[in-house]
């Protein structure tokens, strides 16, 4: 686990590639409830739950990226589309053993609060983006909303996998009024989250 600012970005990419990203407890509980009546579950039922959790959404898109054939040029940009591609029973098989963020961060409550704060911000940004795109009659409403939901994914992952570093960034921002998040990330991580997303989630 990268636990110092000297950790190279490639170390992060290897960690994220080999780790199981946790999801919110409410997400796991809701999906477990659906799984009990799987024959009556639709892709939309699953999507309505997954789309409320940026961590679950990221896991879902990652799975679809793995399963897509190189001959399939159609890009899937909605959570429901991802579930349709995977199929309902295969979805529950693939995510039968979800890790829970609240359990992972039980011993570091400050990190859990930090993670949940970013999740709430991302959900609000996604909802506002969807409303604005709908008002503009944009043809890519789902894509815009998902982009907003996942915009701060790298920050969430730092809280999950390196909470000490995330707290250093938080302290630096509080001590330096007017400092941008990117500058704080560069100071602590030696790279900004945008770079991490481009390299690790491409």
Language model: regions and residue ranges:
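Conserved alpha-helical "signature site"
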Residues: 1-170, 174-202
């Amino acid at each position: 686990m990268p636990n110092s600012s000297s950790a190279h970005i490639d170390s992060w990419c290897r960690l994220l590639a080999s780790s199981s990203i946790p999801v919110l407890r409410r997400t796991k509980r809701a999906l477990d409830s659906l799984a009990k009546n799987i024959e009556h579950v639709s892709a939309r039922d699953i999507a309505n739950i997954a789309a409320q959790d940026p961590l679950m959404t990221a896991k879902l898109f990652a799975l679809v990226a793995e399963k897509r054939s190189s001959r399939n040029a159609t890009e899937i940009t909605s959570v429901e589309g991802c579930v349709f591609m995977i199929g309902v029973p295969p979805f529950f098989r693939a995510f039968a053993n979800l890790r829970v963020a609240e359990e992972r961060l039980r011993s570091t409550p400050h990190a859990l609060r930090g993670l949940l704060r970013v999740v709430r911000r991302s959900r609000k940004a996604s909802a506002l983006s969807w409303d604005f795109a709908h008002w503009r009659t944009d043809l890519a409403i789902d894509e815009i909303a998902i982009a907003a939901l996942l915009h701060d994914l790298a920050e969430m992952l730092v809280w999950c996998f390196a909470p000490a570093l995330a707290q250093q960034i938080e302290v630096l921002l509080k001590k330096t009024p007017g400092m941008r998040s990117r500058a704080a990330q560069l100071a602590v991580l030696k790279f900004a989250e945008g770079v991490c997303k481009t390299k690790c989630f491409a």
